[in-house]
Amino acid sequence: MSLINMAKREINCKVVYYGIGLSGKTTNLHYIHRTVNPADVGDMVSIDTETERTLYFDLLPLELGRVHGFQIRFQLYTVPGQVLYQQTRISVLKGADCVVFVADSQASKLQENIESFTELGEELRKMGKNPGDFPLVLQWNKRDLPDILPVPVLEQYLNPYRAPSFEAVAVGGRGVVESLRVAINTTLRRLERV
């Protein structure tokens, strides 16, 4: 849920990068942070505990203009993907305006991807959200590796809602900006309807 700062005439939107451990969520955020105009981006913050890490930063894309007279700011978050950090994922997911689900395209990771995507849907439902109507972008990452699944197979198992999806090689930036752009545009369309 977007946070509105009336004093600053600013709307803060939260985009969460979700997926299994080592799927490329952190790589996405690092690439975005490195390549965006430095005037448009805040410092990358890492919330580290003894065994996990969550990253986030603010993105103020000035070219977007205003919605209902408010400047729009996006906060991009990653969640720890390892199974034992479910509570942290739930905490970070709360208040999200959009989710970018980063799937590892390797065949050996399909079951983990399915479990993570199922968990995402369950948590959205617990928060009173309809996963089929919630702003979602899917990213088929690691397309440069051997033993990857064809996109139609990933779509079959991980995209029941026919959300926008992109092939990606996050380490090289392929598909990263495109996924973010659609996440931002989807979020903005929702805001404009309010």
Task: Describe the role of every protein-language-model region.
Residues M44-L84:
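Switch I (G2) and immediately adjacent beta-strands of P-loop GTPase domains
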Residues D144-V194:
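Canonical P-loop GTPase G-domain recognition
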Residues L22, Q82, Q106-S108, K142-P146, ...:
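Conserved nucleotide-binding/hydrolysis micro-motifs of P-loop NTPases
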Residues Y85-S108:
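Inter-motif core of Ras-like GTPase G domains
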